[in-house]
Amino acid sequence: MASKSGSLYAIPMDLGGFEFTTFAKTSIDSEVTGTQKYKSSWDFLLLLSIYKIVFNELQITEIDEVNEVVFMLDKMGFSLDSGFKADVTKLSKLKIGTSIVQFDAEFEKEFNLQPRTYLERISILNEKMLKVLCDVELNDRQISLIIDGFDDILRYKKNKMDIVASLIRSADYINNALMMKKKKIKILLLVREDLIAMVVDPDLNKIIHDGAISLSWSNRLDDLKELVNLRFKLSGVREKDLNACWKNMFPNKIKNKNSWEYALDHTLYKPRDILQFLNYCKEEYPQKEKLTISEMQNVLKAYSNRYFIEEMKNELSGFIDDDLIVSIPSIFRRLGGRAFSLSEINKLSNEQCTKKNITIDDTKMLLMYLFEAGYIGQLVSSGKDVKRSVIFKYRNPTARIDYYQQFITHQGLHRGLGVRLLK
């Protein structure tokens, strides 16, 4: 669904449920790896998506060049009314040659050329589509194509990094081409940092370094509170009552902290976390206007069990063996909220996963992803001082893991695991 604000058209494109197995058939050559393997296929899908926005959302239907491209695509079998999944299926059929006759007939008519390969077909078509976009007049309107839902690719074992790398390369290529022509069209990719870290390509490193923005709320907690207030406003709370809304809903103090800080301690400082907590408040106590301390803690237990623990498992999917992921809640439950070492969690992992041997390297990888995602913290001692501090990545984005230190689980996991909360 498009979101329009003034002259800006923000269009979400969710890759959740994307047919990666089908898309994998569209590689230009089985011998090619890295960013070029799927770039041409991504170029086509992204350009086709932009044409759908230009034609269907902005309703630019009176420019001959645009109409010619739209008509040509329709004749080739790619309708602007079709969904993303259908486009991927048609593209894969084109690659393997099952729908090539109709496409080639229109291609020869348009370009006066008989194509020999999939790459030739799609590259020439992409060039035509991009050239027309670079010349179209948007009348000060802006388009943002926002691509999210990359998590599903982690479940796809083969070529997943080539697919991600090619998408990043494609978005960068199209963005640069449109920017050079001063067109206010931008493709935005919302990608987890741990997924980006898996892409090993020197050229992509420069693209990511120059064009990536890291989203962190660790130093923007006031903005996070404003976002929550916006949610209250959308729920019907009057503007003048927004600042007092949280205080009116929750206890003033819990364990020497105000209730806002107490709730944040059970999150990773992500908007989604705190909004999910509010959803569970409504779900658990739909008739209550203000929760007691006991009721708020009951909500945190439901939030931890049904959301926070599941989010942790989802974040590990595709990086860590599935059997080990399933065992993690049991491993953490046995730890009981206390500090643990690399060797101890390796021992517990092998006790829980009896069907396979979990090596120290496997355990290091598990700890690294848990630490990077914020679900475990590092206990650090300074000199001879007995008092230790806890470092979490989501609070300190520059933190680096040290496997020789002890670790501790995030407080947001404890209630769902049924372990004693640390004081």
Give, region by region, the residue ranges found by the protein language model:
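Short, hydrophobic, well-ordered secondary-structure elements
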Residues: 43-48, 144, 165-168, 188-191, ...
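Short beta-alpha junction loops
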Residues: 16-19, 191-195, 382
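C-terminal leucine-rich, beta-strand-based interaction scaffolds used for sensing/assembly
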Residues: 15, 181, 250, 254-423
